[in-house]
């Protein structure tokens, strides 16, 4: 399935920028060398996401189910959805595992990064077409998908009941356009390998520290002997999914 989304600030809208007018109190006889002008522009950007959809046993379109959004890493980008089944929940589903969630696993286009606003558009599309319990929407991702999880949790914390970024990079915690403190009240479970040479452990540590500085209580699991692949153990652990289901938005 393919989602096409036009957005500038996350939803389908056109941003109109109008230059403000500046007026100065000058003597009536004085001539001004400033003239009043205006500018307007329509800015749009298109995203097209293919995605895998898993419906749990018992789904009939009437009873509402929780939703798990899974974001893959950089190596699975492209236009072949088979790549998305290499890791994480899609891999487990392919092997026959049954989940109590609707699982949505989009594929990021080649040479692109996850965009939080486009992903929320995807979520809205899925919610509109399926019976989803909006109080139990969860997000997790690995590596580049861990970055996407941090992005979604920071820009749209109200949309998620819990988040689990795995070996992901977050933006600098104190930058003005990225505010992890918005998600400090959310349940967050972070995973990382101590010997990760691709995304250093410090990347997750500073995000965890940023949440704690603002009063958050994130869980942080460090695998002492793991390298970049800290996701296999994480996604194979039933406790992760039990933890997700134990949370819902108020």
What are these regions (language model features)?
Residues 129, 135-183:
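Primarily recognizes the serine-hydrolase "nucleophile elbow" in alpha/beta-hydrolase
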């Amino acid at each position: 399935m393919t989602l096409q989304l036009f957005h500038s600030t996350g939803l389908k809208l056109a941003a109109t920028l109008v230059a403000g007018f500046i007026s100065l109190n000058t003597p009536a006889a004085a001539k001004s060398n400033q003239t009043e002008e205006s500018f307007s522009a329509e800015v749009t950007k298109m995203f097209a996401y293919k995605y895998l959809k898993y419906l749990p046993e018992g789904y009939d379109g009437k009873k509402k189910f929780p939703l798990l959004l899974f974001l893959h890493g950089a190596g699975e980008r492209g236009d072949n959805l088979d790549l998305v089944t290499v890791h994480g929940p899609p891999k487990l589903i392919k092997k026959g595992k049954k989940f109590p969630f609707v699982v949505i696993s989009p594929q990021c286009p080649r040479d692109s990064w996850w965009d939080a606003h486009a992903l929320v558009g995807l979520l809205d599309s899925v919610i509109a077409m399926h019976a989803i319990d909006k109080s139990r929407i969860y997000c997790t991702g690995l590596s580049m998908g861990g970055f996407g999880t941090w992005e979604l949790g920071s820009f749209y914390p109200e949309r998620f009941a819990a988040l689990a970024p795995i070996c992901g990079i977050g933006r600098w915690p104190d930058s003005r356009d990225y505010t992890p403190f918005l998600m400090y009240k959310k349940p967050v479970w972070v995973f990382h390998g101590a010997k990760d040479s691709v995304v250093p452990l410090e990347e997750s540590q500073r995000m965890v520290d940023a949440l704690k500085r603002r009063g958050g209580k994130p869980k942080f699991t460090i695998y002492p002997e793991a390298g970049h692949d800290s996701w296999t153990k994480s996604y194979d652990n039933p406790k992760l999914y039990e933890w997700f289901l134990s949370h819902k938005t108020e």
